[in-house]
């Protein structure tokens, strides 16, 4: 029997919605990264985008364990000499774009390359409960019910 290799035309992509209220960031990100790549499917093919389209709502209400909310630092560089900047996870979550914490966690679990960029395009993260993807009829995925460690009382 020959090894199965999925063709891009054969892939059917599902729409999945996840409510991130009270979920632990790292555990949510690993599950989302796996589904974006399609590794949860028996038809997974490494060089084909066979993952799902994922919508994450309430990303502002995620939880970091331990002291990471205060101590975890996100760095970026302006491009100028001495232009390295840092922000804590707390300042990002309380700031203008709290969904960036979840986006960065997932992005750093996806391979860096052309296919990884396409797969990251299948992720939509919203800080609040509203999203513009009702027409796609996403099916809800209850991450908190999968494992008791996925959820923390905030």
Curated annotation (Swiss-Prot):
GO cellular component, one term: cytosolic large ribosomal subunit
BP GO terms, sorted: negative regulation of translation; translation
Keyword Ribosomal protein: yes
InterPro entries linked to this entry: Ribosomal_uL13, Ribosomal_uL13_bac-type, Ribosomal_uL13_sf
Keyword set includes Ribosomal protein: yes
GO molecular function, one term: mRNA binding
One Pfam family from the record: Ribosomal_L13
SUPFAM superfamilies: Ribosomal protein L13 (SSF52161)
Keywords: Ribonucleoprotein, Ribosomal protein
Domain of life according to the entry: Bacteria
PANTHER family: LARGE RIBOSOMAL SUBUNIT PROTEIN UL13M, RIBOSOMAL PROTEIN L13
Reported function: This protein is one of the early assembly proteins of the 50S ribosomal subunit, although it is not seen to bind rRNA by itself. It is important during the early stages of 50S assembly.
Binding partners and assembly: Part of the 50S ribosomal subunit.
Similarity remark: Belongs to the universal ribosomal protein uL13 family.
The protein, known as: Large ribosomal subunit protein uL13
